[in-house]
């Protein structure tokens, strides 16, 4: 099977074979070839790769991946990214999105809560997803937050954790103006992080628009 062979080599060259879970390999390849629901992915793997993996197994593996493999997967991803970028991560872009569920918000302790939704689904249960990527868009880190969490409160903890974990120095943080509250700017400065605030040109004053 050509996709399995070609994408399998890419998967191994990145280093994900070190995770040691065949189901992860199958899910990654299926996601690249035909991104769809877990149920449809199960059928796709059976039809095209003759892999008998039920959607229940896929859901259980998602829990395993998050609970026991997340650190290893991140380590592999970051090392691969550093190799591509010449051994150093100099720019980090941070952004946030919301992912909603076709369900009512859960109990108070549940991470799935109603909140400001980027999909206009403010009454649905959702989670907040924070994503940190390098230049050229290589993923560095992701974090999941309670659906009612204000997105501005997510940025600094994610960056601090990543910097500590990978001993980063001399880098620039880039985020849009919605995340760059005065409090976050103050925290960036106190940590001596360089930063760039993204903004819409049309919202800037005439002097800045002319300069751009």
Q: What residue ranges belong to the model's regions?
A:
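Dynamic "connector" segments at or just before major functional cores
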Residues: 1-113, 123-124, 130-143, 148
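Short glycine-/small-residue-rich flexible loop motifs, especially phosphate/cofactor-binding loops
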Residues: 8, 129-130, 160, 185
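Catalytic cores of nucleotide-enabled group-transfer and carboxylate-activating enzymes in metabolic
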Residues: 68, 114, 125, 131-135, ...
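Glycine- and acidic-residue-enriched helix-capping/strand-helix junction motifs
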Residues: 118-119
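An internal, acidic/charged active-site-proximal segment
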Residues: 151-212
